[in-house]
Amino acid sequence: TDVDDDGWLKTFTIPANGSSITAVASLEFATTDGKYNSLVKLDADTYVNAWQASSSKGKIGTYTIPADGSSITEVTTLVHDGSSITGYNSMITIDANTVLLTYTGESDDGYLKTFAIPADGSTITEKIVLEHDTNYSGFSSVVQVDFDTYALAYRNSNYAGAIKTFDYSLTAATMNPRISTVTIAADNSTIAVTMNEAVY
């Protein structure tokens, strides 16, 4: 977000030793308002950004960025909340084609949403919508705990820090097979691996 509240995406090259930072490509993705951004990587060259757009609408977009960062190409965008949102976006990738977004919506209520996005970023489809706090939810930060559990930290209506956990079993049922936990015995003799589905 620049001095005029316009939204920008930029790429930089940084060598392994961190000795320099070189600007490579840039894209002004929002010429009016592009605030409270949250950017995640969906796959090798597809990125997803959520932000507060003009008229305080909630918007999400996909972008193609090659590994060398030589270009930034907008693929598609979606206004997912047409009301007046406050922002405070926090988004994570939860599966190969799914992102989870938390944000402060209309009347400062707290929302969680999931979106289905194909590998090429050509479409954005809203799937799950949950209003998790009807009083106030600000300064959100969401993390993944395991394959279907997520933890959200935020400021509530009492100006206190709050943490909530969410279990999306419906979403987890459609996820690709993956390791959910790994436990090493005290004597390092065995490793117990638990998958997110039955293994035969």
Predicted regions and their residues:
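A short glycine/threonine-centered beta-strand motif
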Residues: 188-200
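Surface-exposed or flexible loop/turn and strand-edge residues in extracellular/cell-surface modules
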Residues: 24, 179, 188-190
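Low-complexity, Pro/Thr/Ser/Gly/Ala-rich linker/spacer regions in secreted
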Residues: 168-186
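Extracellular, repeat-based ectodomains that mediate carbohydrate processing or recognition
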Residues: 1-172
